[in-house]
């Protein structure tokens, strides 16, 4: 009898220690019956009962404030072509010059080429070295103009040399032609047509025979005479 009581007390002590060590099994260890929750009036009227573990749902309204951001207006300015002085000398390193009018005043800017930066595109983007140099279009225009001037001066010298050579040859040929004509006139002076082989009768006037030169020789003689007179005037 005493041994059975001690065994019962030991079992009770083990059960209590187990319940204290695992509190989530206290409900299972309890010998009381858990009362079932009563159904609400609405559920009893509708005939459907809520589950015992379902918590009451509370509706809450949240106010959200939405902020709208207005985009910035896209303002564009009309661009104009720079004057010739600015277009040739203002922008550097093959940059493009353009102007923008603000309050009726032109503001000049440069559109830099790839690899350059700065107000006048005078800096490199890598090491910021200063490279002021004249734009290539200006140098190309200067070279073309100088080449055209050299060609024009050369043509003038060639034309002048040909003119002087022609004048010299014309003067020489005109002088030789004049000498030949003078010699022919001296040989035929005092002779008449009727008495080349015999003397003229008394009272007959001698007729001087004028020898006419061919047409091409007369034309050449006229040109040479004109050239001589023109050279004497100069």
Curated annotation (Swiss-Prot):
Single GO cellular component term: endoplasmic reticulum membrane
GO BP terms in the entry: behavioral response to ethanol; border follicle cell migration; cell surface receptor signaling pathway; determination of genital disc primordium; dorsal closure; ectodermal cell fate determination; epidermal growth factor receptor signaling pathway; epithelial cell proliferation involved in Malpighian tubule morphogenesis
Bias type Low complexity, positions: 56-71
Bilayer topology annotation: Single-pass type I membrane protein
Quaternary organization: Interacts with Star via the lumenal domain.
Organism whose genome encodes this protein: Drosophila melanogaster (Fruit fly)
UniProt topological domain (Lumenal) ranges: 29-143
Name by which UniProt lists this protein: Protein spitz
PANTHER family linked: KEREN-RELATED
Reported function: Ligand for the EGF receptor (Gurken). Involved in a number of unrelated developmental choices, for example, dorsal-ventral axis formation, glial migration, sensory organ determination, and muscle development. It is required for photoreceptor determination.
TM region positions: 144-164
Residues annotated as domain EGF-like: 78-122
């Amino acid at each position: 009898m005493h041994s059975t009581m001690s065994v019962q007390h030991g079992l009770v002590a083990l059960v209590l220690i187990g319940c204290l060590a695992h509190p989530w099994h206290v409900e299972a260890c309890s010998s009381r019956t858990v009362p079932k929750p009563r159904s609400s009036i609405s559920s009893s009227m509708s005939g459907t009962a809520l589950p015992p573990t379902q918590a009451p749902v509370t509706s809450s309204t949240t106010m959200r404030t939405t902020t709208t951001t207005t985009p910035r207006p896209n303002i564009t300015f009309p661009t104009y072509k720079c004057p010739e002085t600015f277009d040739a000398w203002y922008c550097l390193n093959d940059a493009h010059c353009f102007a923008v009018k603000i309050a009726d005043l032109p503001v000049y800017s440069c559109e830099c080429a790839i690899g350059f930066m700065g107000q006048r595109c005078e800096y490199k983007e890598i090491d910021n070295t200063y490279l002021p140099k004249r734009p290539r279009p200006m140098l190309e225009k200067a070279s073309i103009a100088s080449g055209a001037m050299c060609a024009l001066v050369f043509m003038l010298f060639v034309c002048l040399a040909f003119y002087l050579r022609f004048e010299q040859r014309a003067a020489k040929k005109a002088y030789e032609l004049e000498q030949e004509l003078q010699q022919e006139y001296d040989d035929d002076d005092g002779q008449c047509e009727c008495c080349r082989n015999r003397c003229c009768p008394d009272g007959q006037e001698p007729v001087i025979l004028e020898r006419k030169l061919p047409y091409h020789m007369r034309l050449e003689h006229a040109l040479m005479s004109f050239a001589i007179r023109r050279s004497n005037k100069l």
